[in-house]
Amino acid sequence: MPATHPTRWGTKAASLYDKGYAARYRSHDDGLAGTAAYDGFVAWLQEVCGRCAAPFDALDLGCGTGRYFCALRGVRALVAIDASEAMLAQARHPLHQDQVTVAAVTMVHGDLMSHEFAAGQFDLVYSIGVLAEHVPLQPPLVARVQRWLRPGGRFAFSTVHPDSRSIPQTPARRLGSSIAPWLPGPLRRHLRDRVLAGGLYADEDRVRELFASGWAIESLVRLESEAHLHCLCVARKAIV
């Protein structure tokens, strides 16, 4: 399926992850296998799958090379979207391909910020290493995912925490983080948005804000990878 209405985020990803980069990225997958961080993400996604009534339908937002396809359990049909055709080509031969149990995988070349799926199409939408990292996690995207989920469906995703060692803790950032809670509403929100880089980082408080209405947060934990400190969230769409 062709990409539709690319945003600047999708265009940037498609440009960055060209054929050469995608091949190197896929080679990096092989080196990640067995590391504590990778195993932590796999165990988390498997646990999320265990909460869903099998068989169920899933969407991978920003699937990349299909690094986590092997973690899925009980999935009847998987849709995997990415803005890079080169990454999708690599995802056809993902890490631990012999462990992938999903019978039907549909690859979609598209921008997750603008591509549309049917309302109520999925029981699980998941995204690892994309949201609040390469793509801003903001209310419009949360609303899109909510629309795509069936009642009671789950949205499982990682973010980069603003306290991650990978983020330079400049004096301005430290000052902004310390004074933001004491400022009046509009100014506090503006400064918080600056600290969170317009949605490219998200801490527990920001996740709770985004999922305060129409969702129930089932779990919200931290995980340290080789690159970042992450939040791992599972939010469930309201049944009624």
What is the predicted role of each segment?
Residues 1-52, 156-182:
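Conserved class I S-adenosyl-L-methionine
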Residues 59, 65-114:
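Class I SAM-dependent methyltransferase SAM/SAH-binding core
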Residues 126:
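A conserved beta-strand element that flanks and buttresses the S-adenosyl-L-methionine
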Residues 196-214:
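Short alpha-helix
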Residues 133-144:
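A short, conserved alpha-helix within the catalytic core of class I
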Residues 149-155:
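Short glycine-dipeptide loop
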Residues 215-240:
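Core SAM-dependent methyltransferase catalytic element
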